[in-house]
Amino acid sequence: QILIFGGLMVTLSMGIRHGFGLFNLPITTANGWGRETFALTIALQNLIWGAVQPITGALADRYGAFKIMVIGGALYALGLAGMAISTDVLNFTIAGGLLIGLAQTATTYSVVYGILGRNVPADKRVWAMGIAAAAGSFGQFLMIPAEQGLLSSFGAQNALLLLGLMASLMMPTAWMLREGKVNHNLNLGDQTIKEALKEAVSNPSFRLLTLGYFVCGFQVVFIAVHLAPYLKDLSSTFPAVGSPAVATTALALIGLFNIFGTYSSGYLGQRFPKRFLLSGIYLGRAIAISAFLLIPPSPISTYVFASIMGFLWLSTIPLTNGIVAQIFGVKYLTMLSGLVFFSHQLGSFCGAFLGGYLFDRTGSYLIVWQIAIALGVFAFIVNLPVKERAITRVANA
């Protein structure tokens, strides 16, 4: 039950957000805004998500995830409705940035992984996290064509309202993820939240993980938000890649192959050193982006790139969270996963915002693509020395 409804929760939350890039041009064109405006809203959404995630995680660890997820589902629906009816930048940013950013802290991986960590045996934990991540990937694959269909049939405003109704399904889903009190009474002595935080931030491997996770956020959010307009811009020279169908198919392929990638990373993470798998993922991304820029653009090259990136897309999540659980145990897993996730969201903010900012000033995304490549090599290096051993305090967790 936990795997099924936890997977459904991230299917809805991650699936809806994965399609936001499709709304970039329709919304900015209709309102006469620059791409920087939409990019800033999504960037703030990711930053708020990351900044508040440790707090939401601590509340979920302390009081139970169910209440947190119900509130998150309500905020998600309100945020989408607010995006639909907003006609000025401030209201749009509050709805899409603040409300949905807060909602995602309560409905995505960190909270669900906390539930799994407390209720799944340690020898199956990373596998279960891979299953949950694969469910989120399925949501991305499912929702991209659905959101494009809503856009084409009803326009951006009505499409967002319908997505808001869909987001409200997260509230009854949360009801099925209620935990018994026994799940929170884990044997970790009398360690407090403050002590757990101090223990984590002083751990070199935890710091290296957070650096690598910054890169993950930068790359995936830049591509999710700016791939569609990037392909549209290429249409003047390469008309075949500018069709909305190409961008929709590419984003759907990312979601499809992400299913296999996240499941595979969870499976392999039970059998091989997770740090080496993480390093390989980041290096693979750098190579894939480099090849995408060097090969003449075409629908086929775009689909191949999307498939490779999809396989590597969120495969970092079960591995990173698995290492955190392995080192520190599961009592404060939601909070500590949220803390390392904050670094991911700082990267997301930079990827989303820099994409729009530098495009509006240079007329090109090339510089941001090059940054994404360099960061991939950096993350490959910093994950290699991570130590996966449990610290003495939580050796039996």
Segments and roles (model prediction):
Residues T11, N91-T107, F214, S301-S315:
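Hydrophobic core of transmembrane alpha-helices in multi-pass small-molecule transporters
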Residues H18, N46-P54, F141, G255-Y263, ...:
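Residue-level signature of mid-helix packing/kink "hotspots" within the transmembrane helices
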Residues F20-N24, N203-S265:
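Extracytoplasmic gate region of multi-pass secondary transporters
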Residues A51-L90, G269:
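Conserved MFS/SLC helix-loop-helix module at the cytosolic interface between two early adjacent transmembrane helices
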Residues G96-A134, G329:
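Cytoplasmic helix-loop-helix junction between adjacent transmembrane helices
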Residues A132-E179:
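Helix-loop-helix hairpin linking two adjacent transmembrane segments in secondary transporters
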Residues M176-E195, T392-A397:
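Flexible cytoplasmic inter-helical loops of multi-pass small-molecule transporters
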